[in-house]
Amino acid sequence: MARTIDLNADLGESFGPWRMGQDETLLELVTSANIACGFHAGDPDVMAETVRLAVSRGVALGAHPSLPDRQGFGRRPMALRPDEIRNLVLYQIGALAGFARAAGGRLVHVKPHGALYGQAASDAAMAEAIAAAVRAFDANLILVGPAGSQLVRAGQAAGLAIAREGFADRRYEPDGTLTPRGRPEALIEEPAEAVAQALGMVERGEVTARDGTVIPMPVDTLCLHGDGPDAAAFARRLRMELAARGIPVAALGGWLSGAA
């Protein structure tokens, strides 16, 4: 049987009446939702509504904690102590878990956002602080991070189940990190190329870096960015291609076992 893959999207990133992304449409296409917890985007009303919609569609709930940086959308690196990282992650997980419980759902995973995700990929102390926060809240939660990263290693060391994430529409560097968003070639804008990259990670566990190097990239979940105008169309196309290859799509909590 073909291996199973999860499809996730970063959602709940609106503020008040200002709308961002295509959350309602994407919730019909993805299996897991990473929901902003107020530190880079979202607010209590948006969090509550996004959780409600996800629960009503059977989409797995995930907390998407960030560094405290609304102006920079959580994408600016910060130098914080490990205890500060642990506390801000724990705070945000707890906030989203409250909305999940109120809506009759439960948290399944935690995926850091933006600079928190990027820094923790290579910073062992930051990664360990994030893993400690997740374990302290609920040792049954799945920690999502890039394959081969310090974040994944920290999750395994903490005894957590981990999910290795790949990005369909982002280019990679030869060391396996994402090409910085500031570079003009950071995003893959041609849908066919993005689909091919996603299939390469799922079927062969590899990706071609920006310089042409083929590097290992085994994945359990693929991130589909929801803020582009063609996000929903791309998600439909990818699901169709996966189905054509007999690759099941399902939320992490339904099939991913503990990896530690």
From Swiss-Prot:
Keywords: ATP-binding, Hydrolase, Nucleotide-binding
Catalytic reactions of this protein: 5-oxo-L-proline + ATP + 2 H2O = L-glutamate + ADP + phosphate + H(+)
Organism whose genome encodes this protein: Methylococcus capsulatus (strain ATCC 33009 / NCIMB 11132 / Bath)
Claim: Nucleotide-binding is one of the keywords in the record: yes
UniProt-listed Enzyme Commission number(s): 3.5.2.9
NCBIfam families: PRK05406.1-3, PRK05406.1-5
UniProt cross-references to Gene3D superfamilies, sorted A to Z: Glycoside hydrolase/deacetylase
Keyword Isomerase belongs to the record: no
Name of the protein this chain belongs to: 5-oxoprolinase subunit A
